[in-house]
Amino acid sequence: MAALDGLPPLRDVIQRHGLDARKALGQNFLLDLNLTQKVARTAGGLEGMTVFEVGPGPGGLTRAILALGAKKVIAVERDARCLPALAEIADHYPGRLEVIEGDALKADFESLAPEGAVKIIANLPYNVGTQLLVNWLLPKAWPPFWQSLTLMFQKEVGERIVATEDDDHYGRLGVLCGWRTEARMAFDVPPQAFTPPPKVTSTVVHLTPRKNPIPCSVANLEKVTQAAFGQRRKMLRQSLKPLGGESLLVKAGIDPARRAETLSVEEFCLLANSL
């Protein structure tokens, strides 16, 4: 992509700005510009879109998003060392890149969103990725301000996101994602694509909001899944005892002898609505 956007190779950018990835910030920089384009393309058409990015680092994915025609990228970066490298990209794409220095967990993304839906594309820092996803799934207003999420996680997290009942990876995250989105794993990214190479394979997950998820209280769904999966090997009559146990299950029409991993998203919503 260096030839396409006229900017130097990422390795040169990292060396020139002294950007060693820091474990404390959950950083692993994706250097392969062909892969960053593949990530950006997974989000679908970007022409005229506003895109939010978290943890752009030296800007490899940022460059891919801009090169594919995004109208504007709003990037939240906590590491001040990366700002000069991102400023060079902003100069190359005048008016199309806004960088906000700060903690993405504290950012109010919805207030930053322009009129019309946005897409969120990010190689998420490993230490905050799951919490950010949960934050984006929990707004009371639905459909949300975002049109799609295209996010990179450790593969184990990706498997939890797309898992359904009777899957070993199924848990609270799978229920939440299955309730409000349609999620798929797009492709894996090997450790050697990053600097420094992480110990595990990564995966890109693409999520789109369900227009009409089952009406259900977020707070009640959280209570039910926390209790059920907190003791996932026990029968539901035991794990849900603090919430009413057998009487709650009978009210929802669910066999009290079943276990959490056998319940569908719809059945968890039934339980939440029976509280």
Swiss-Prot record:
UniProt GO MF annotations: 16S rRNA (adenine(1518)-N(6)/adenine(1519)-N(6))-dimethyltransferase activity; RNA binding
E.C. number: 2.1.1.182
Domain of life: Bacteria
A Pfam family it matches: RrnaAD
Location(s), subcellular: Cytoplasm
The keyword Secreted belongs to this UniProt entry's keyword annotation: no
Catalyses which reaction(s): adenosine(1518)/adenosine(1519) in 16S rRNA + 4 S-adenosyl-L-methionine = N(6)-dimethyladenosine(1518)/N(6)-dimethyladenosine(1519) in 16S rRNA + 4 S-adenosyl-L-homocysteine + 4 H(+)
Family: Belongs to the class I-like SAM-binding methyltransferase superfamily. rRNA adenine N(6)-methyltransferase family. RsmA subfamily.
Protein name: Ribosomal RNA small subunit methyltransferase A
Gene label: rsmA
